[in-house]
């Protein structure tokens, strides 16, 4: 039976509501309470070298800043990850994983830059990170483009490849179409993730369909506290 991992991305996706200004005590409180909840993966914010360091915000210019914000936390989940919107954080601002508080990095990108973004994912993997390739606007991909992307995924073998329903356009059948393409063609070592949005009030239905589908791969499903995130 394949494994299911829950990824909490409140401190990252929730930041679209408050420009990532949660306040340091709230940041660490959310982090430690999500650890207590049993979530296997916690995403702690964006890495974006266009933004200055601010201990009260979960958008950080480099990996060292993650340690400065979270380093005193007593508890930690099995995996801590950050997110990079491809093109917004240079490799020189990413420490080797062994020197970093992070275990993994998720990279979001649109299909027209899939080749450049997947090469960036390969460089992050060389630094020792578990890399998640996040397919923004999954509904923009044709089946042929999905197969092109899967070719890159199978070459690089990231930790996971994830469907991102950026505009909340999927319904369960539509989502499962993309999922089945991934499940049938991605190497067994690569996990498959799903990040839903609730524009048409279908996020919960889509997540249930994703979780209940018979599958060959381990999967990762995203969630936030109170559904906090980008509308």
Predicted regions located by residue number:
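Alpha-helix-loop-beta-strand connector modules within alpha/beta enzyme cores
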Residues: 52-82, 121-134, 176-194
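Conserved, mostly hydrophobic/aromatic
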Residues: 14, 34, 105, 161, ...
């Amino acid at each position: 039976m394949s494994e299911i991992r829950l990824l909490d991305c409140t401190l990252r996706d929730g930041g679209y509501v408050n420009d990532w200004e949660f306040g340091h005590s709230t940041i660490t409180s959310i982090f430690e309470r999500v650890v207590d909840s049993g979530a296997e993966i916690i995403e702690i914010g964006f890495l974006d070298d266009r933004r200055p360091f601010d201990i009260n915000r979960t958008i950080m210019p480099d990996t060292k800043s993650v340690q400065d914000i979270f380093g005193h936390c007593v508890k930690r989940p099995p995996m801590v990850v950050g997110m990079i919107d491809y093109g917004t954080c240079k490799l020189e601002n990413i420490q080797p994983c062994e020197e970093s508080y992070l275990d993994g990095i998720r990279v979001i990108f649109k299909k027209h830059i899939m080749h450049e973004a997947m090469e960036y994912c390969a460089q992050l993997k060389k630094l020792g990170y578990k890399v998640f390739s996040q397919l923004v606007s999954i509904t923009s991909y044709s089946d042929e483009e999905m197969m092109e992307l899967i070719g890159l995924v199978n070459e690089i073998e990231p930790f996971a490849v994830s469907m991102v329903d950026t505009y909340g356009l999927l319904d369960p059948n539509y989502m499962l179409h993309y999922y089945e393409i991934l499940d049938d063609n991605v190497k067994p070592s690569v996990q498959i993730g799903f990040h839903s949005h609730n524009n048409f009030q279908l996020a919960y239905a889509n997540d249930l369909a994703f979780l209940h589908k018979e599958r060959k791969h381990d999967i990762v499903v995203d969630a936030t506290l109170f559904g906090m995130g980008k509308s």
